UniProtKB/Swiss-Prot annotation:
Protein name as annotated: Co-chaperonin GroES
BP GO annotations: chaperone cofactor-dependent protein refolding
Origin species: Aquifex aeolicus (strain VF5)
Family per similarity comment: Belongs to the GroES chaperonin family.
InterPro entries membership: Chaperonin_GroES, Chaperonin_GroES_sf, GroES-like_sf
GO MF, one annotated term: metal ion binding
GO cellular component, one term: cytoplasm
Oligomer status and interactors: Heptamer of 7 subunits arranged in a ring. Interacts with the chaperonin GroEL.
């Protein structure tokens, strides 16, 4: 791949999830699934440009497996493969032991918490 990200940008290749089946054995097609939010960093920029003109090195490095928000980055196609170009700020976490997840799964779900009060409670 010939892509060199600038400043605090990183290039991420999504990690594919295993095939999903419903309890009744129906295979869920890729078009019906959400895109994975786990990826491998394949390129990093030189660092974040600070107000004083200095570059602050990035925390992530090539080869890191990262977790990111489903709306993070911009998709680009390079040599027939789809990559995400995003700011380091869009990375939620670095997965320290990805080998323990192989064959398993990572699920990321955002939940909205609602607070309701019953009548008579403060």
């Amino acid at each position: 791949m010939k892509l060199r990200p600038l400043y605090d940008k990183i290039v991420v290749e999504r990690l594919e999830e295993k095939e999903e089946k419903t309890p009744s054995g129906i295979i869920i097609p890729d078009t019906a699934k959400e895109k994975p939010q786990l990826g491998k960093v394949v390129a990093v920029g030189p660092g974040k440009l600070l107000d004083n003109g200095e570059l602050k090195p990035l925390s992530v490095k090539e080869g890191d497996v990262v977790l990111f928000n489903k709306y993070a980055g911009n998709e680009v196609e390079i040599e027939g493969k789809i990559y995400l170009v995003m700011s380091e700020d869009e990375v939620l976490a670095v997965v320290e032991d990805y080998s323990s997840l192989i064959g398993g799964e990572v699920r990321w779900q955002q939940r909205q918490l609602s607070t309701t009060r019953k009548q008579g409670q403060n």
